[in-house]
Amino acid sequence: MVYSYSEKKRIRKDFGKRQKVLDIPYLLSIQLDSFKKFTDQDPTGERGFEAAFRSVFPIKSFSGNSELQYVSYKLGEPVFDVKECQIRGITYSAPLRVKLRMVLYDREAAPGTVKDIKEQEVYMGDIPLMTDNGTFVINGTERVIVSQLHRSPGVFFDHDRGKTHSSGKVLYNARIIPYRGSWLDFEFDPKDALFVRIDRRRKLAASIILRALDYSTQDILDLFFDRVNFKIKQDSLVMDLVADRLRGETASYDIKDAEGTVLVEKGRRITARHIRQLEKTNTTELEVPVEYIAGKISGQDYIDPDTGEVLVSANAEIGLEDLAKLSLAGIKEVSTLYINELDNGAYISDTLRIDSTTNRLEALVEIYRMMRPGEPPTKDAAEALFNNLFFSEERYDLSKVGRMKFNRRLSIDDDEGTGILSKEDIVAVMKNIIAIRNGLDEVDDIDHLGNRRIRSVGEMAENQFRVGLVRVERAVRERLSLGDLNELMPQDLINAKPISAAVKEFFGSSQLSQFMDQNNPLSEVTHKRRISALGPGGLTRERAGFEVRDVHPTHYGRLCPIETPEGPNIGLINSLSTFARTNNYGFLETPYRKVIDGVVTDEVDYLSAIEEGRYVIAQAIVELDENNRMMDELIACRHKGDSTFMGAADIQYMDVSPQQIISVAASLIPFLEHDDANRALMGANMQRQAVPTLKADKPLVGTGIERTLAVDSGVVVAAKRGGYVDYVDASRIVVKVDEAELTPGEAGIDIYNLTKYTRSNQNTCINQRPCCSVGDPVVRGDVLADGPSTDLGDLALGQNMRIAFMPWNGYNFEDSILISERVAQEDRFTTIHIQELSCIARDTKLGSEEITADIPNVGESALSKLDESGIVYIGAEVKGGDILVGKVTPKGETQLTPEEKLLRAIFGEKASDVKDSSLRVPNSVKGTIIDVQVFTRDGVDKDKRAVEIEEMHIAQAKKDLTEEFQILEDGVLGRARNLLLGAGFDEAQLDAIPRSQLLMQTIDDEAKQTELEQLAEQAEELKADFDKKFEVKRRKITQGDDLAPGVLKIVKVYLAVKRTIQPGDKMAGRHGNKGVISKICPVEDMPYDEKGNPVDIVLNPLGVPSRMNIGQVLEVHMGAAAKGIGNRITEMLEEQRELAELRGYIKEVYELGDEVQQRVDIDSFTDDEVLRLAKNLKGGVPTATPAFDGAKEKEIKQMLALAGLPTSGQLTLCDGRTGNEFERQVTVGYMYMLKLNHLVDDKMHARSTGSYSLVTQQPLGGKAQFGGQRFGEMEVWALEAYGAAYTLQEMLTVKSDDVNGRTQMYKNIVDGNHQMQPGMPESFNVLLKEIRSLGINIELDQK
């Protein structure tokens, strides 16, 4: 494999054995592609804005004299960029402008004669835009729209699993689900009649809907039944014989062939052998006794030719008397419905008998009454309602997906079709459910991923936009019918508010629009790849059963079987598998390699769950020879959802990679194959909660996906084009682009500005640091700067810690963790958290609130950290209770006593008419102010601090743009200089020419002169561009802010808090091995090895066997080897050994392993590259053991041997306190530990006195309210059982809701008198009031 310059800085040793056929696709494509389809112009009009506009327009007036037509749309440019929107707290969006055409028709002339046409561009609201990383900025916060897994439109057949009826009889049902519109259900009742429901309302006989579709009783019978024809003879009947129909019946008479030979005796069951005999003798007619027809059902009306009287009506039972009547009337032939118990039930016939309607109108009225109970039906209303239900394109849409699923399920060849239902569709569904009831077809599996599809952000936004458009449509139609249209323009007809409101509601408050989980890069990526079955149109937690939540065979390679939340949402929220993607219909598909005659090709096909069922698919772990031919005779494979063994020749596809079944988070767990799934689930979920540490540390034992994830998450800065690094500082990287990648006429400079110390959604710190040096060559995709939780482009969520598995004085009881003081001293798990605190000055009824340093009754020391505007300085160290922003609020006027009036006259007005409402630091918070932002309403005077901040921002913007301009100008001048050097000028001449004159030189060579003139033009453009950019920036900074109504000023203060690790913090490994720190132990007391090196963390060995996550033990062994090799390399460097020896050792490390795919050609590295690689490997050789394809025990032992460590992975340790050796050897190695975002500082809380609930007078609950601990029912029982009467009295009175008692208690404590006088708790008064509210008077007699 060829490595770039930056990749050679540190290479991860990969133990993967399988050939990589397919790179992991871009991880955020599900979000970006979906939204791109929504916003991109689509000439076909099948999706996005175009589809929404075409579905609603043209809007015609009620009279038909005018209409509003849609022409085209344009999405403008956003006013503010993403960062500005986040700072200002506004939505990152772009204006949507639509060109509409208003057409007026001439009433007097022929229909369709145009009188006037007006075209105009109309503003239709702002549409939130997606950022490059797949998020939306709504009101200043980053949000993610989670994709939804919902039931695909189409037709589904199911049954109730015998739960509806007490007999346990299975009742079948069918449901037609459209994309928009009414649901249509068909269902059997226990008596086997077929019923229909519309939108889950009251059920009607299914034949009613057929009558409403204009089918008569005769038509219905013809549609659903075959006929049996009888010829009437003197004393018998002759039946037309279809031999197959007799199978399974019991002969009620002797069955004879044409010659009179008895084939089946009376009373015998007719078998397949008898049928074959009948067919052999070509028997087409059979003489049967007259009694045979009794009870059979007539297939048509029989009318007396003379009188016109109906002798036997269709669907009526024929008796012997009826037969006599027919014979008398001269009717020679009778046809009955072919019905048998086995596979041809009389379901529709029974249904027709229940049905009280006889014609179309009655059926329509019946449907109208069911849909609109209480309204008097009219013919037109009933007809309109029925048509609008399923046959109107405005109200009903199956969608392309729905039509495709519908047609495939009912075996209709064409996948295309209309979005509305037809008569034939409804009949086909009824025929199919009857076939299922007859045992001729199967019900569907609704949890199959072929029946569930993904609705992504673009589709949901389009639906919401359409909802807004429909609201506008109603208003437009009314306006077109009223008023003088000659004077109106399209602008006057359209009100953009309903559209904006619908879109805003979706992005702001939909259940699927979620506050982005921004703990670390992994949590961001996972959130964007999440698939939820909840949300509008989906399931609810309470209703979802076990089947929906369970892992289904079709999840393979599509949804991760491991990563899902624990708790009520388990199985309802899933994660997309690593290689999965959605197809055009929204179904999930996964890639497979094609196999032809046992030979695996490199051709990759993406298959959906439906397609996959048709093929035989082998796993990725199949052994292949050098020609990619399968070596085993029998191969484990999957077919139609079952696992089986088949020969190599039968295999049609093979998995692309062993990791394709799991999600990104699960594939970050090394040795995943050795962990129990429950613990792996916890491991995958806890990695998302890891807080970025101060100094990121790459995992020594990884899986090889770390770099892909870090780059795709967007937290690192990756090179857009190749070149070399020209300039680096903490906030900017400049890359000079290679000539080969330049587009003609550009400066050839790429500038990357880095994000510095900004706050994430979870209050963690986002900071980017350059990881390249000036002069480094870069290629496209190389990592130039690390973000949070990344180290040299690798995802680094935690720290590599030296672990020992042993008990230590009970401090690791029940998963507790003992850590060394050294870990805290070295700041290994120190994290920075940034809090945003806001102070809002409002306009109140009594006057405006004011931000000022002049605060009543506050001492000088409390104001020491504020400037003259009353806002805290940047860099100030603050603690709980300190004032950050001084604010005073006007107080209501009260009647003053003469004494107060005198005091006011002496000391001035100020003190009494305002109260202090300053922003203070929350209790138990201590940190440093790192930034202050002031937002002032338009028209309100800016204070001194606001002006200073503004000037600072302008100066910073000017500096940035000037530097950017100079870099680009230097690039242009550098190319001009090279051009002049090639045209006869020498260095000395060029040095003498001033910079400004360099581009004005003349050259004899015409081509070069033209090029020089082009460069001069370019320099001019750059200057003009710089001036324009600066003016835009300046205007944005100085303009007033658009604040909420009534808000005059907002001050945002950013506080950085440094959190070191301490007892009570939660830590975890990657295998679900979590615990809480019990003690930070001095280094000298920690167990140490024979060389005197102490361990960092002691874990309880009992945490491994019962939890079955053995992966952690293998990780510790591999980590020990990786670190040991790093120590050997460090020794070589310190002893300044020969470079050849170092190169040889490193080569030996990378070549270890028999079937390993990775090949690192260390011989091709230069001496400098080898030295740089060795320096980066001093901390340990990072290794990769991919899931299901990782390092074997033998390879771990080889690595340990190479590191000079015992191959058992165990060492003899000594007790740090006594110096004595422990009895047995201990497993010691390196494990990657994470510090989770459950910090003791956020949870620890104590209360003495504080606020009380107004009604109950009991202390509030929770840390946020500075509340107390609940002393509940069971705790009272405990004190009662113990007999601690006085403690109990104290708990129930002065410590709870005895108002007078607690006031007295406070005074007593102040006076040093430690006694209490309990009174009556307030809860008695509450009880009194509750009883009185029931109308019962109850009073307390106080004696």
From Swiss-Prot:
Q: Which domain of life is it from?
A: Bacteria
Q: Which reaction does it catalyse?
A: RNA(n) + a ribonucleoside 5'-triphosphate = RNA(n+1) + diphosphate
The family database entries (PROSITE patterns) matched by this protein are listed as: RNA_POL_BETA
Q: Which GO terms describe its cellular component?
A: DNA-directed RNA polymerase complex
GO terms (BP aspect):
DNA-templated transcription
Q: What is its EC number?
A: 2.7.7.6
Q: Which UniProt keywords apply?
A: DNA-directed RNA polymerase, Nucleotidyltransferase, Transcription, Transferase
The family this protein is said to belong to: Belongs to the RNA polymerase beta chain family.
Function text: DNA-dependent RNA polymerase catalyzes the transcription of DNA into RNA using the four ribonucleoside triphosphates as substrates.
Give the protein's recorded name. Answer: DNA-directed RNA polymerase subunit beta
